[in-house]
């Protein structure tokens, strides 16, 4: 972090850096700036990240602000998309399931159609939580169940498909995923009155395998909503984090 921050601050040249926006994965105390994660950034669990960043940069602690990485993604997607959506839902699909609800460019953690805390990863679903059904873990387990082949991540499935191996199995898995993802999202899209759904994260690289089915699942329920892929998730997250300091 020290090296990366130093390089960024050097690029600013003579321009004064008046704030620092940081996007972090949950769980994290975004008010106090305390790391809490067991499995992500475990080496800094309990650390006052705000204090450490102040020590490294000299930036006023009151101007070092934190947000959830999924919230950063949503705010960045809204900004990079021209800010035309009034009610935008952003989701990141990969090793986890991040979500955010954006109202006129602002991150919403409560309100009509917004889940508690504005997050969906732990939303109760089929006796478990939503993340269990839309993360890469689900793909790994489903592919192993069907084919007997162990994989890590989704990319090996795509590679098999392009090598004309397990093509029917891969298609069936993505079809099931699209239906399940639509089932999770539909009530929130409807109650929130979303006019755009933006999808980012590692899974978006496989959009051709599930976006058409996802759109069709929404249309079958009478929901017409643009489903947009944000391939450069990192840039969107950084843009959203930077927006905290405006």
What is the predicted function of each stretch?
Residues 90, 97-102:
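Short beta-strand scaffold segments in enzyme catalytic cores
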Residues 25-28, 94-98, 203:
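Short glycine-rich anion-binding loops that position phosphate/pyrophosphate groups of nucleotides
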Residues 76-77, 100-104, 108-110:
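Short beta-strand-to-turn element immediately C-terminal to the catalytic PLP-Schiff-base lysine
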Residues 1-19, 28-32, 53-62, 78-89, ...:
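ATP-binding/phosphotransfer module of carbohydrate and carboxylate kinases, centering on a glycine-rich
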Residues 43, 114-117:
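A short acidic/small-residue loop/turn micro-motif
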Residues 63-69:
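General beta-strand structural signal in soluble alpha/beta enzymes
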Residues 33-46:
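A charged helix-plus-loop insertion that forms the helical arch/lid used to bind
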